[in-house]
Design a protein with these regions (language model features):
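Conserved N-terminal helical subregion
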Residues: 3-4, 58-61, 70-169, 176-184, ...
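Glycine-rich FAD cofactor-binding loop and adjacent beta-loop-alpha segment at the N-terminus
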Residues: 6-9, 13-74
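Glycine-rich, N-terminal phosphate-binding loop of Rossmann-like dinucleotide-binding domains
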Residues: 13, 160-161, 292
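Central beta-strand plus flanking loop segment that forms part of the substrate or channel wall
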Residues: 163-198, 228-232, 247
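Conserved FAD/dinucleotide-binding core of flavoprotein oxidoreductases
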Residues: 204-267
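Glycine-rich phosphate/pyrophosphate-binding beta-alpha loops
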Residues: 207, 271-273, 289-301, 339, ...
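FAD-binding beta-loop-beta segment adjacent to the flavin cofactor pocket
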Residues: 267-284, 342-343, 359-361
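C-terminal helical "tail/cap" subdomain of flavin- and related membrane-associated enzymes
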Residues: 312-408
């Protein structure tokens, strides 16, 4: 193959793009990683922690990534319950009762380092330039760069939200809406052992999540994801001592004495859904396809689900000798993932709006739903299965099998 001809071109420099590079290496397809000029180092100091489903963790293991993570033994979802206040509704997911792992909490930096160590990519696999145009031919697309370089690719995979230029050259359109909320994330040190318990508190202005982390140098640690009205964020973060005092008042009952372990970061929350995930030879996955509210902690699991479907299509293309955009698996992806993705994003948005509403109808609905779910193990299992990779049919990598294992 010509040195500028590739099976896939992978756009982005985050975790999703790196896993996609790993998929390409694992299944023997040629690829180039187009990182872009401005994005190359943006993820170096990311302090977030991610909740991986058991299926996602198993998928990474098949690809050679064994992550050191904290298993979630219980996921405790509460309306109220902070500042020694009354608990108005609750759902408890217990891994022992469900007989399956709920989630695994791992720091972004740990995942990133594990991926980079496994990949060990040299410069021949990547480009740190931004494309200026993409044209379509019958059997491939051409990607043009400012430095006159031209790349040919059978499939262009976008893993991060497309900037204005990329939207224009790929004819991508998004539907946007603003949550009018901002998320705060940081790592907390606390006096009590987290016991592997995760908490999700639904508060008046948005959810607050505590995710258990593994101990570091005998220190008890948890990750905080706190969503507040954007208009309140500057006050919440104005003073570290006041921020710590507020967290102790809210969560001290569960974690003991709390200290902020790393400086918090904040980011505004917006919902974005692409109108089509497959446009000619351009496919959008992960953050390129959707931005969702963080209350369920499912954004990266959804990205890995995209990748698992795409891996099936790549293997099918090789086995059957078909152009990848003609493969049944990719056509199924286009149809099925759009429906799944939209339903998931809108469902999470609906839950957020219901818990922020002060109407008596919304209060009655959410508390009755929490009571129903908490008393029905079958509903808990259904929710846990959907979060873990799909309650019904799953792609091969999410059932602990190599991609393409279902293809005859």
């Amino acid at each position: 193959m010509n040195k500028n001809n590739f099976d896939v071109a992978i756009f982005g420099n985050g975790l999703t793009s790196k896993v996609m590079c790993l998929v390409a290496l694992h299944y023997g397809v040629s690829f180039i990683n187009i990182k872009g000029k401005e994005k190359e180092e943006k993820n170096a100091d990311d302090i977030r922690s991610l909740a991986l489903s058991s299926a996602s963790k198993g998928m990474l293991k098949i690809l050679g990534i064994n992550l050191l993570s904290q298993p979630v033994k219980k996921m405790i979802v509460l309306e109220g319950g902070v500042s020694r206040g009354k608990i108005k509704g609750k759902v408890i997911f217990d891994a022992e009762e469900l007989q399956e792992q709920i989630a695994h909490i791992c720091e972004y930096s740990v995942i990133n380092k594990s991926l980079e160590k496994k990949l060990k990519l040299d410069s021949k696999y990547s480009i740190t330039e931004d494309p200026i145009s993409i044209t379509e031919d019958r059997d491939y697309s051409k990607i043009f760069f400012k430095n006159k370089k031209i790349i040919k690719s059978k499939l262009n995979i976008f893993t991060e939200k497309l900037d204005t230029n990329q939207q224009n050259i790929t004819n991508t359109e998004y539907n946007f809406s603003d949550y009018d909320q901002t998320a705060i994330t940081t790592t907390l040190e606390h006096s009590r052992d987290n016991k592997g318990y995760a908490y999700q508190f639904f508060l008046k202005n948005g959810p607050l999540a505590l995710l258990p982390l593994k101990k570091s140098r005998s220190k008890n640690l948890s990750s905080l994801v706190w969503t507040e009205k954007t208009s309140n964020i500057s006050e919440v973060l104005s003073n570290k001592n006041v921020f710590e005092k507020t967290l102790n008042e809210l969560c001290g009952t569960y974690l003991g004495k709390i200290k902020v372990y790393v400086d918090p970061i904040s980011f505004p929350l917006k919902k974005a859904i692409c109108k089509s995930q497959l446009i000619n030879r351009n496919i959008l996955i992960g953050d390129a396809a959707r931005s969702m509210h963080p209350l369920a902690g499912q954004a990266w699991n959804q990205a890995l689900r995209d990748l698992a479907y795409l891996a099936d299509a790549i293997v099918e293309s090789k086995k059957l000798g078909l152009d990848i955009i003609s493969c049944p698996s990719l056509l199924t992806f286009k149809r099925k993932r759009k429906i799944e993705s939209n339903a998931f994003v809108e469902g999470i948005s609906f839950i957020n709006s219901v818990f922020m509403s002060e109407s008596s109808l919304a209060k009655g609905f959410r508390r009755n739903m929490m009571k129903l779910i908490n008393n029905k193990d079958i509903l808990k299992k259904l929710i846990a299965n959907e979060a873990s990779g799909g309650a019904l049919e799953r792609p091969s990598l999410l059932i602990n099998e190599e991609a393409g294992s279902k293809i005859i």
